[in-house]
Amino acid sequence: MAFVRNLLLVVVVVASIAVWVVLPWPGALLLAVLLAAWLLLTRRGRQAGSVAGVGISTLRQRLGSSAVIVVGIAGVVGVLVALLAMAEGYSETLRKTGSRDTGIVMRGASASEVMSGLDHDSVVLIAQAAGIARDAKGEPLASPELVVAANLPLKNGGPDDEGSVQLRGVGEQAWAVRPQIKLIDGRRFQPGLRELVVGRGAARQFAGLVPGREVRLGNQKWMVAGVFASGDAMESEIWGDANVVADTYGRGSSRASVTVRLADPQAFGAFKTALEANPQLKVDVSTTLDYFSKQSERMTKVIRIIGITVGVIMAIGAMFGALNTMFAAVAARAREIATLRAIGFSGLPVVVAVMLETMLLALAGGLIGGVLAWLLFNGYGASTLAAGTVGQLSFQLHVTPELLWTGLKWALAIGFIGGLFPAVRAARLPVTTALREL
């Protein structure tokens, strides 16, 4: 019989955690309101509140053991939120890079620009497709581009410390295709010359990317002409004239992709249909929003898996700390609990009281961990090798309200498990045995 009760208890725990994980904050608020109503309006609820009040009033006497729960859970929440904020910041940076009124065309079955290649004839045909916006001279707003890897010395690094940056060769219409890109220092590069404009993120990460300075790329000296800002992944790149980049790196007349500005977002369908129906072309067509969102998925998933794995490992430690602390608290209050049972308190108020005490400590730990994660990591700059590129992507960690809520749910879940088993043990404690032993 005891085995069946314990098995049912485990099932209840698993089911409760499964529901809690997917519960939105309005659902949690509703549960809190229902619990408060039960505590205030029912006899057993008032009994549970009385017992919980006694336990909470003794927390000062158990400050050390209580701090173990709070600090442990705060650590879990802080680390979890920080790692998930990294995934959120990475994903957000790539999502902001694209839009629905720009399209990108690559060779068919290419997963990214790095793996794509378009010959000169294909590039010419793509620029003539329907749906592309045109400038005042009637020229299509299409930028044939290629990407190559370049190594540059890192800022604040040793003499031999280098990092990979993505060098993008762009066409003359690149600025019109991406109007969000603004020069913040210097000027644009001159077509036909070995000149560069560098993203703000790349300038922060690599040494020598200052207007007027020379850097060596592909065994050639290049002059840095300016610095641009865009608020997206492009800030991690450096740009040069596509023809010059192709000559320097032996790419001939081929290009990795063609990025176009559409006449309007609704024109994408006609643009894609025209290219896919052309028997001379074998290409993949997507909006830049879809392309960069897809590029972010794999790395975002990896970072989230790492964050959750680390969080689970730390949560197990915090949970055992909570179990140990609450079992000790129940043992120390065995006579008090037995006396309450003897004068008519049922088992349910005792269970709820112990659970409330543990959940209160867990809530405090979750709030502390969430606040620390927001203060320390929100907006913190980081960089990593971006999926589908050959360079580092600079981004900022983003601690969102959703991530803070996720951390708080983890904290309360740890408190729930850490308090439930000691609470059930307290409720099952035989009254006569407890009074006789103590």
Predicted regions, residues:
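Peri-transmembrane interface segments
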Residues: 2-17, 90, 264-320, 329-331, ...
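Transmembrane alpha-helical interface segments in multi-pass membrane proteins
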Residues: 320, 327, 332-381, 406-414, ...
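Hydrophobic, regular-secondary-structure patches
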Residues: 74-166, 187, 192, 273, ...
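Hydrophobic alpha-helical transmembrane segments of multi-pass inner-membrane transport and secretion
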Residues: 63-90, 300-336, 359-368, 417
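N-terminal Sec/SRP start-transfer signal
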Residues: 1-11, 36-77
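Short beta-strand boundary microenvironments
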Residues: 161-205
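Short helix-loop junctions at transmembrane helix boundaries
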Residues: 6-31, 367-409, 420, 424, ...
